[in-house]
Each structure stands twice: as C-alpha cells, then as structure tokens.
Amino acid sequence: MKGGTIQISWHDGKPVLTVDFHPISGLLATAGADYDIKLWLINSGQAEKKVPSVSYQSSLTYHGCAVNTIRFSPSGELLASGADGGELFIWKLHPSETNQSWKVHKSLSFHRKDVLDLQWSPDDAYLISGSVDNSCIIWDVNKGSVHQILDAHCHYVQGVAWDPLAKYVASLSSDRTCRIYANKPQTKSKGVEKMNYVCQHVIMKADQQRGDETKTIKTHLFHDETLPSFFRRLSWSPDGSFLLIPAGSFKVSPTSEAVNATYVFSRKDLSRPALQLPGASKPVVVVRFCPVAFKLRGSSSEEGFFKLPYRLVFAIATLNSVYIYDTECVAPIAVLAGLHYAAITDITWSPNASYLALSSQDGYCTLVEFEDKELGEAVSISVGKKPVDGEEKKHDLEKGDELMTETTPDESKKQAELEQNEESKQPLPSKITTDGKEKEHIMQKTDDEVMTETRHEEENQPLQSKVNTPVSNKPARKRITPMAIDP
C-alpha cells in the first residue's frame, strides 16, 4: 500500500467537501466550496513504486453555491450533486466518439436549505437526500419530482443511506437519532404498488446499569449538534448485511467519560447495535464499505465477529484519521493518521478496490493505492438474495438491549494521548508506505524521501502548492479492538 496527500490545486485552495468514484470508468469526482465538480483520472504509481497521481479531465459547472455531496448512480449513467441553498441537480452522461461529457439532466427543487448528503436507490430510479431543513426527501428521478418526504428529525439531517436490497433507508441527524425506514408499499386503485417508507426504528439511547443497583438509566448513543462537522455519512455493506453508523458516543458507565465509536447494525436486528468499534480520539464522521468482497484468508489467529462466506472491507474516517477494517479480523488492518491539517469530509473506494480517496477541508485530497490482491482475492456477491444466516455476530444478541464494552476510560485516554502526540509531530505527511511483513500498515517517511519527492513534484506539477512538510520518523501506529455488546 502506498499513498499520500496530492498537493495540487484541487478546488482553488478551497475546502474539498465530497468525493466519489465512477462505478464503471473509475474516474474520481470531487466537489467543494468553489461551486464546481471536477473529474480526475487516477494514474497508478505501482510500476515506479511511487504515490499515485491524478490528471485533470473536466469540470461540471452549474452550481451557484458550495457543493456538499456528489454520488454516481449504480449504473454510472447519472450523477447527483447537492449544494447549499437546497440546490440538487441530476447530471447525465453523454458519451461521444471523442470524449464523454456530463450535462444537467434535471433540477430537483424542494429543500429550503443546504443539502448535506444523498444516496441512490439500487435501480437508479430514486434518490434520497438529507438537508439542513431537518428533512429527508425521496425523489422520483425519472419524473423529477418529490416521491415522499420524511420529516421526523428535529435537527439537521447529515447522513442518508439506501439499502442495496431496497427494503430500508436510513438517516442520521444531529438531533442524536438514527431513523430506519422500511418499505411498506401502498396498493393503488389499479393494483400497482407504490413505494412507501415507514419509520420502523428510532435509535437514540441505550440502557446502562447504575453501579450495583438494579435500576438502569438511558444514555445517548450519538454526539449532539456540537460535533464540529456538517457530515455524518453512514453506509450499508454491498450485500445489505450490515449498516455502519458514525458519530457514536458511548459511555462504559453513567459516570465515565464518553468514548467515540462507530456502531455496526445487523440486518437481522436494526433496532440496536450488534457491535461497536471504539477508541478513536476524534469523532467519526464518515464510514464507507468497499464495493468488492474478498475471499476468506482463513489464516488469522484472531477470531472474527462475523460468520460470512467472504470478507468485507470498510473504512472509518474520524476528523483526523482513517481506520480500515475487514469482517474477518478484530483489529484494524490499516491506520492512517496525520494526513491533513483540517477535518476529513468524505471517503470513497474505487470500483475495483485499488484506491481509497479522502477529501478534507484543508483543500487537499489523499489517495491510497493497494497492490494487486493486497486486500485479498475478489469474489462475487449475489446482491438481491437473502443475507446469509451466519451474518450475525457469533455471540447471542437476542436477549437484551443493554450496550456494554470492555474498553476502560483509562485505556481510551491513553489511546487518545498517543494519537494526539503522534499527530502533533507529523502535521502533514505526504506519503504512506507499508512493510509487507507487518500486519498493521505504518505511515513513515524519511527526510531524504521528502526532499526527493518535493523536487520531483515541483518539476512535474506546476499547479502544486509548495509546502514544506514536517516529518516524524516515529511510525503512527494504533490498535483498536472492536467490542461486542454484552447482552
């Protein structure tokens, strides 16, 4: 694995707020506070053992405000973009013999305030958006009209996700709730069923034991509106088995210090978390599953939490770091920290799992390239079939709603202090390397490498901002152990 922060003028030095890969061509789309959407071609650096680079392709200019979210449709024929002021456009691909161009296909107007997140339905026919006006809207893309309004939240809706099996949609808000909606079609007079999503679960609090007493108190599962991010982007697994929800804030006991966490929900029971991934020093703002499933390694000495016939890989981004997990291993398989000066805003995987991209408010993007079969051997997923019976955590989760963890406050403080100390010594490393003999990926860069890479970039990238990168020879390494919920 190699990667680094590509120090070019992505969006005229303004914050990059969102990124997404085209599901077919692999083009990278970025958007931000300069009102434009830009398309980039990724150039592999494996042959020369260098950090991957990008080549500018084109700009999509139509928005009059900062663009907060962009998402390609599953077919790759459409692109949706949401911006400040409620702007929401659908772009359509117009291929030609010489090039490919994107033109505005529809303008979806109803949101009164900023659109913060959106997600396509599996069939490209519908779109769900979340907004600062406290509502989610399901759009009929073909008609260009509102299909359904979900307005139960009482604060900003900062993340939305559409189940790949088309049964559920989920929304996450700064009102400290996550709402799960189930599709319960309504039958029209002509016998045609109309899609209709009804709130099935409101995830807000969990029971906690009060010392040795038999009484319990309820504690919030999510951060409140003081979380310093406009985004809480959640994600379904590509097979629909799991839902990852960021912005978790969990207390081991009612009097303990809150621990930042990501919650894993099983499709079999979406009313409460099946698993939590604690330990990050900063709040989690974005989660994203890799679209590719991988063959089981079968050689791990650690017992995993899920019985799946394949491995799923996912990335968790906090305000200042990224953790990469798979479903076969308890510990993260990679930790990336100290990459940006400002908060991370979005992450995305390439369709072939070769690249992971992330954007930041500091105006830069980071690209990570994985070597061939570094993540494993790809296998197919039969989306549309019922999730496997063994998708659940190995422990029995059916007996109670109590949320427990073995992580102590002292351990969490030590982890937070370690990460903060490492980041203060390494503000903006521009290269990520790994040692193939180690299980964890280690970010490290020598002074000679910095000088060589800086000279090379100055000669070959005229738009690049000339930034002297402080470097630490101390690896930024961190272990986080996910904890199952003890019923």
Swiss-Prot record:
InterPro entries: CAF1B_HIR1_beta-prop (IPR055410), PTHR15271 (IPR045145), WD40/YVTN_repeat-like_dom_sf (IPR015943), WD40_repeat_CS (IPR019775), WD40_repeat_dom_sf (IPR036322), WD40_rpt (IPR001680). Residues 387-487 are annotated as: Disordered. GO terms for biological process: DNA recombination; DNA replication-dependent chromatin assembly; double-strand break repair via homologous recombination; heterochromatin formation; leaf development; meristem structural organization; nucleosome assembly; pollen development. One of its GO terms (cellular component) is CAF-1 complex. Its main location: nucleus. Residues 461-472 have a biased composition (Polar residues). Disruption phenotype: Fasciated plants with broad, flat stems and disrupted phyllotaxy. Shoot apical meristem enlargement and altered floral development. Reduced heterochromatin content, more open conformation of euchromatin and dramatic increase of homologous recombination. Keywords: Chromatin regulator, DNA damage, DNA recombination, DNA repair, Nucleus, Repeat, Transcription, Transcription regulation, WD repeat. It is found in: Nucleus. Component of the chromatin assembly factor complex (CAF-1) involved in chromatin assembly following DNA replication and DNA repair. Required for several aspects of development, including seedling growth and leaf hair differentiation. Plays a critical role in the organization of shoot apical meristem (SAM) and root apical meristem (RAM) during postembryonic development by facilitating stable maintenance of gene expression states. Seems not required to maintain transcriptional repression of heterochromatic genes. Involved in heterologous recombination. This is Chromatin assembly factor 1 subunit FAS2. It comes from Arabidopsis thaliana (Mouse-ear cress).
